[in-house]
């Protein structure tokens, strides 16, 4: 009888320990989720910045990667990617390098078409159109004979100019993940077509689907802050073997001597 009581007591203590441990883990996970959201909120607070020249007076996170006296360079990038059953994958977008030292901005409007040959091999063709920015206006630096294309470039707006995440904390049922080995982190939300940012994208792009997108915020590097890592956002409307429709955007603050587009990992779905 005494042995039975001791056994029951031990079992109760084990169950209680497991319960307390689980609560502790849940609290730790919630704390990490909160840290990830706060990290994303820092960059999302830049949206919207209607006048791109305001970035000349904005300073981002600085670390030992910056040389003394370097004011840094902002890299902003937006592009739309569309592939349907009846068309090849095509991306159209722009990247700008906003140098705070020289207060000058240059970049490229890039059109990429990806085709597949009869053997199933993919081939990409990039066409770049160099641009500069003056008085918040995008100006091609080389003649463009195609009037429609020239107007598309001159009228181009980056997502950071019109996107708005003031309601980001109201987004429900987010899927937050963290990989300490990389380190990398992300937050995914299912949006509705009534979402402000979704409406803005549909207003500016001919998006050939009525499906509401998922918003993916992703980053890598130290959660406490780093100029080496990157943060990107993606609105994915459709993603399967035959069709891909998504929009990507990023705003990064980097040392001025390190403005290579590829080296900064702007997106794993980059040009």
Swiss-Prot record:
Protein name stated in the entry: Uncharacterized lipoprotein SAS2373
Lipid attachment site numbers (N-palmitoyl cysteine): 23
Keyword Membrane: yes
Organismal lineage: Bacteria, Bacillati, Bacillota, Bacilli, Bacillales
Annotated lipid attachment (S-diacylglycerol cysteine): 23
Subcellular location as annotated: Cell membrane
Membrane topology: Lipid-anchor
Family to which this protein belongs: Belongs to the staphylococcal tandem lipoprotein family.
Keywords: Cell membrane, Lipoprotein, Membrane, Palmitate, Signal
Pfam families for this protein: DUF576
Keyword Lipoprotein found: yes
Cellular compartments per GO CC: plasma membrane
Domain of life: Bacteria
Region forming the signal peptide: 1-22
């Amino acid at each position: 009888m005494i042995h039975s009581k001791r056994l029951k007591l031990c079992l109760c203590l084990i169950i209680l320990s497991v319960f307390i441990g689980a609560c502790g883990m849940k609290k730790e996970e919630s704390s990490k989720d909160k840290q990830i959201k706060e990290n994303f909120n820092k960059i999302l607070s830049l949206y919207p910045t209607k006048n791109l020249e305001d970035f000349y007076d904005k300073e981002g996170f600085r670390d030992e990667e910056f040389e003394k006296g370097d004011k840094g360079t902002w890299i902003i990038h937006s592009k739309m990617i569309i592939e349907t059953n009846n068309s090849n994958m095509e991306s159209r977008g722009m990247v700008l390098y906003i140098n705070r030292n020289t207060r000058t901005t240059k970049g490229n409007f890039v059109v990429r078409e990806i085709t597949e040959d009869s053997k199933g091999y993919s081939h990409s063709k990039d066409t770049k159109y160099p641009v500069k920015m003056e008085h918040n206006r995008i100006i091609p630096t080389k003649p463009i004979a195609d009037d429609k294309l020239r107007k598309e470039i001159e009228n181009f707006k980056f997502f950071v100019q019109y996107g708005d995440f003031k309601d980001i904390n109201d987004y429900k049922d987010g899927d937050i993940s963290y990989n300490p080995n990389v380190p990398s982190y992300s937050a995914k939300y299912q949006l509705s077509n009534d979402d402000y940012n979704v409406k803005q994208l549909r207003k500016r792009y001919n998006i050939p689907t009525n499906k509401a997108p998922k918003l993916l915020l992703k980053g890598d590097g130290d959660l406490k802050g780093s100029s080496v890592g990157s943060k990107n956002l993606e609105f994915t409307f459709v993603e399967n073997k035959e069709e891909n429709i998504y929009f990507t955007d990023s705003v990064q603050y980097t040392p001025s001597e390190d403005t290579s587009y590829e080296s900064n990992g702007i997106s794993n779905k980059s040009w």
